[in-house]
Amino acid sequence: MVTTATRRWGAGTSALVRALIATTRPVSQVELATLVGVSQPRVSQVLSRLTKSSAVTSTTDGYVGRREQLIDLYVDNHRPALVGAEVPWYSLRPMREQIDQLFAHANSTGTRVAVSADLAPDLLAPWRHPTLTVVYVDDALDLTAAGFVRAEGRVDATAIVRHTSDTTLLAAFEPWRRSVDELPLADPVQQIWDLHDLGGADRVDAADRLIAAVLDGKLAVES
């Protein structure tokens, strides 16, 4: 594992790291600033820190991330930017049916959605039966009309809704798959973080399987 900072990352740093993991070619500071939506001085500052951590190298053509080191840093330092506390919900339906219903309800209210662990990793690199799924949204979302009931906490929940102020969490960076059967997915690096956050040895195994798929390029959508 690489040495981590004591301060948690902001949304811009996290997005830059996800972007560096997604690309396989050298990228300039200007490209990264445009891609992520932060200032070039901020990009320079983040790249300097990542270079000192041996997670990024500078070449004559731009910056190249070391994917495995960057993923380790992301798992240790990232925290999603949330508007409020996550909201746990419960449903008796099969997991895929639950999330399809959640997505349909979100669409009816004009709410953007990105599906993360457990369901998204199961769609990309199946390993464990999904029992709880984190969903990121850009607005508060009441799931009562979608057939869910409020749960007391994670232990009772089958879905967790996280209202995020970070819109970069609502779509995967190219070339990663952004949807499966029209269901929008979070970036695989965020899925890895959520597997660790939800916890359990089987989820760590699922995260390792997803990491291997990222490192092997198996999740990239062919152009």
Where are these regions (language model features)?
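Short amphipathic alpha-helical interface segments
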Residues: 11-25
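Short acidic, hydrophobic short linear motifs in intrinsically disordered regions
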Residues: 25-35
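Short gly/ser-rich loop at a beta-strand->alpha-helix junction or flexible surface loop bordering the NTP-binding
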Residues: 82-173
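Hydrophobic alpha-helical interaction segments
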Residues: 142-223
